[in-house]
Amino acid sequence: MKKIIIIITCFIGLSGAFAQQRGMFHNPVIEADVPDPSMIRVGNYYYLVSTTMHLMPGCPVMRSKDLVHWETISYVFQRLTDLPRYDLKEGTVYGRGQWASSLRYHDGRFYVWFSPNDEPHRGYIYTAEDPAGEWTLLSRPPHHHDASLF
């Protein structure tokens, strides 16, 4: 009986020596304003879009392989041009921003839906084959707060 207790005690004592060790991890805080993130994984990369409060360029697209090291690879739009107030003519929407973008991937294409805080209260849906490339306006759906693509 003594041998069994000694063997069990040794086994329990040594079990921690073979446990997986925790690696060193640094908090991936970056010098950026990234509110309302929407993130997906496609292949070996994670992609993230977020709100921009001063519109242009707008809706940054970021990419990471490990969720720690991020790079901004593009913007969904460089300018919004369908209303004069986006160019500070006939009023302004400066500081109202576009918010809560929704990022999705389907059948080889990336999609982003967001709504700016302006009238006539219409959203924007953009699409791209390459998220680091040029994004194309696909649709102007009705405005929805924090909308999400399925």
Tell where the protein language model's regions lie, with residue ranges.
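Carbohydrate-active catalytic/glycan-binding domains of CAZyme proteins
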Residues: 18-150
